[in-house]
Amino acid sequence: MFVMFIVAEVDDEVCVKREVERAAGEVGVHVSLTPFQRREKAEKNLYVVTILGKDRVGIVRDITRAFLDFGINIERTSLTAREELISIEFLVDLGQRDAAEVRKRLRREAERLGLDIVMQPYSTFNREKRLIVFDMDSTLVEAEIIDELAKEAGVGDEVSKLTERAMRGEIGFKEALEERVRLLKGLPVEVLERIYSRIKLTEGAKELVRSLKEAGYKVAVVSGGFSYFTDRLKEELGLDYAFGNELEIENGRLTGRIKGRIIDASEKARIVEEIARKEGISPENVVAVGDGANDRLMIERAGLGIAFNAKEVLKDVADGSISKENLVGLASVLKLPAEFRKKV
């Protein structure tokens, strides 16, 4: 006995049914025609997951195994390398899975493997980014500048403890900042220049900013630190915008007070929105990069939020987490054209 199933799309159901039955009768076979309602494919829930880290044997295997364990389908994969740094881009379908939970699980697995991870919706990934905003301390520069000022003032331990508590979100930023600045009262203004001359840019920061500028980005630093240093960074790196808290100075010494409005988390987010509005850039086209609790709101509201060498409180709300060694990996995450990525 021979049985054949055929699925066909027809324009005139009645005419086709009559002709098929006639032809079947001529060759002596039985035919049964049943209307078939095509089931629409489930809409895909696509995300782009970018893995960054030092190249080693087994990275692709380890990550694909993690996707398999989580039941996530990989649509496609691409890989680029720059010296020791490798960037692997996965297009994945999350299906009905919760993106925040998947991101958290993948981040933990990536950290276990010594890798960085950024996960963003495919729709966001495909959207051209036009503004990138960096925090300053421990992001564009390696130091926490207020701690360096405190050492010069002989109050290093006290200020460092307050800084750590503020970074973890244990005390309010304004409260912590005002208390730390109060401890700097009487510090000569010449110390600020001395500190700026010795702080180091984060590895790759200068090259990354240059490539971002050449690729057409507006680049800003918005910091809860001090405007003396953000203004100097703007000049050195050719940034478009720089915002920081202004230290009050009288007779060549710090008064222990801040002039004007304090830039805390909500003020940072407001400034980012103001820059975007001024430049005619939508929030979805904004990238925010920071390391502490004070960066939380601007990272949550940006189209792409990156926790850089950050505390857990920030990693949990960011789209991705990048370690200190991989700042240049942002060029891959942002899909800068190849000619610009080569310069980073």
Curated annotation (Swiss-Prot):
It comes from the Archaea. Its EC number is 3.1.3.3. The keyword Magnesium applies. Substrate binds at residues 144, 180, 223-224, 268. Gene3D superfamilies: HAD superfamily/HAD-like. Mg(2+) binds at residues 135, 137, 291. Its cofactor is Mg(2+). Binds 1 Mg(2+) ion per subunit. GO terms for biological process: L-serine biosynthetic process. Keywords: Amino-acid biosynthesis, Hydrolase, Magnesium, Metal-binding, Serine biosynthesis. Pathway: Amino-acid biosynthesis; L-serine biosynthesis; L-serine from 3-phospho-D-glycerate: step 3/3. Residues 48-120 form the ACT domain. It catalyses: O-phospho-L-serine + H2O = L-serine + phosphate; O-phospho-D-serine + H2O = D-serine + phosphate. InterPro entries: ACT-like_dom_sf, ACT_dom, HAD-like_SerB, HAD-like_sf, HAD_sf, PSP. GO terms for cellular component: cytoplasm. GO terms for molecular function: L-phosphoserine phosphatase activity; magnesium ion binding. SUPFAM superfamilies: ACT-like, HAD-like. The active site is at residues 135, 137. NCBIfam families: HAD-SF-IB (TIGR01488), serB (TIGR00338). Belongs to the HAD-like hydrolase superfamily. SerB family. This is Phosphoserine phosphatase. It comes from Archaeoglobus fulgidus (strain ATCC 49558 / DSM 4304 / JCM 9628 / NBRC 100126 / VC-16).
